[in-house]
Amino acid sequence: MAAPAPRPLPVAGAARLLCAGRVLELEGAVVMGVLNITPDSFSDGGLYLDPAAALAHAEAMAEQGAAILDIGGESTRPGAAAADSEQEIRRVLPVVERVAARLPLLISVDTSNPELMRRAADAGAHLINDVRALRSPKAIEAAAAGNLGICLMHMRGEPADMQREPQYAQVLVEVRAYLEERVRACAAAGIDPQRLCVDPGFGFGKTTAHNLELMRHLEDVATLERPLCVGLSRKSFVAALTGRAAGERLAGSLALATVAVLRGARIVRAHDVAATVDAVRVANAMRRELH
C-alpha cells in the first residue's frame, strides 16, 4: 500500500528582511543568539554586564552559527520593572559598538527606548527587536527616521503585570489582529514593510494553554506576509511542560524550535545557539523535503 502524501507545510509570506542596508535572506530559518546586558534576566542575568565578557560571548555565538545577535539592556522577564532609559543606553551601546567592530553578523537591539533606537544605528546595529511593537511614545517616529529592520512582538500588558491571569476570547485571532494592526501602523508612519518581521510573543502575557494554542496554529501567523520570529528558549512554559529549571530546558526548547520552523518560523531566538542551529538545520531540511 502506498504511503500517504505528506501534508503541505506552511510557507511564510516573505523570505527576506531589509536591515540597515543589508538583506537577510530567509529561504530557510536562522538563529538569533541572545545577549542580555542586564542584572536580572531570568536565565543569564548578570553574566555579561562587563563589555569584554559580552564580546567574548558574542564571538562564541557567532562561531556557533548565529546569523543575528540580539543585545538587550532591559529585562522583560515576567514581573520585571522598566529599565531607566539612560542606564539601558549605557549598558547596550558599548557592546553594540564592540560587536560591530569585530563581527560580521547582524546586530539586533532588544529595546522599546526611542533614544536607544536612534543611537543604535550609529553604533552599528541593523535591527530593532521591540516587545512593545513600537507602541511606546515616539518609538514609531524613531524607527521611521532610520532604516533598521524592526521586529514587532505581541505582548498583553507590560512585563511587570503580563502574567497576572492573562485572558483572551480567541488568542490566535487576537494576536494575529494585533500584529496586523502594528504592521499597518508602521506603513502609515512611512516604514517600508520589507523592514518588518513579526513575533507572536510566546510567554508574554499568555498562559501555557495560550502558548500551545499559538504553536498549534503558528502557520496562521506565518501567513502575515512578513517573516516570523519566535522566542521559545528556556521560557517558563517549557518548565510548565517539562518541570525543568531555567538551565535545564534545552531539550524542550529545541523541540519547540523544531516545530516552529516546520510551521513557518524564519528567525528562532535562542540562548543555546549551537544546539539550536543544529535543530534548525534539521528542520530546514525537513521543510525542503516535504515541500
Placement of each model-derived feature along the sequence:
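Active-site-adjacent loop and "lid" segments of alpha/beta metabolic enzymes
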Residues: 3-4, 8-11, 19-20, 26, ...
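Hydrophobic "anchor" residues on beta-strands that sit immediately upstream
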Residues: 32, 66, 106, 126, ...
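Catalytic domains of carbohydrate-active enzymes, especially glycoside hydrolases
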Residues: 56-72
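Phosphate/pyrophosphate-binding loops at sites that engage ATP/ADP/AMP, CoA/4′-phosphopantetheine
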Residues: 62-63, 182-195
